[in-house]
């Protein structure tokens, strides 16, 4: 029974986490990268912030369960060492959710 409860808790927590997809997974200096952050609907969601850790980010306001699920942006002219890609969902209850994906720039 203990394992069942722990597994169920992990599944519920994972269902609330954002998902991040990246196209392409690596680029040359000055290349373009399209990222899509998928945010499960939740009445406590207030904002989504996504982008590169050390270069640039963008944010969008969320309206709880009325918010769009996918948020997409094209970053052009990616520099050397922009950092990892991330997607963070800011929540009203302070239990923010974040996913991080490594990214590589070649030719630096």
Regions found by a protein language model. Name each.
Residues 102-108:
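Short beta-strand edge segments in extracellular beta-sheet folds
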Residues 40-52:
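Solvent-exposed loop/turn segments flanking beta-strands in beta-repeat/beta-sandwich domains
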Residues 91-100:
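Short acidic/polar inter-strand loop motif in beta-rich domains
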Residues 13-33:
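Short, compositionally biased P/S/T/A/G/V-rich stretches that sit at domain boundaries
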Residues 3-12:
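Sec-dependent N-terminal signal peptides
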Residues 75-82:
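Surface-exposed, short loops/turns at beta-strand junctions within beta-sandwich domains
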Residues 55-68, 102:
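Solvent-exposed serine/threonine-rich low-complexity stretches and specific carbohydrate-binding patches
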Residues 32-40:
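Short edge beta-strand/loop segments characteristic of extracellular beta-sandwich folds
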């Amino acid at each position: 029974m203990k394992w069942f409860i722990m597994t169920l808790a992990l599944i519920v927590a994972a269902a609330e986490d954002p998902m991040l997809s990246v196209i392409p997974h690596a680029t040359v200096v000055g290349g373009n990268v399209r990222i899509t952050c998928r945010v499960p609907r939740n009445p406590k969601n207030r904002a989504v912030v996504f982008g590169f850790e050390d270069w640039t980010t963008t944010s969008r306001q969320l309206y709880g369960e009325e918010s769009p699920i996918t948020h997409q942006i094209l970053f052009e002219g990616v520099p050397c060492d922009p950092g990892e890609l991330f997607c963070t969902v800011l929540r009203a209850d302070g239990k923010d959710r974040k996913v991080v994906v490594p990214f590589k720039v070649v030719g630096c």
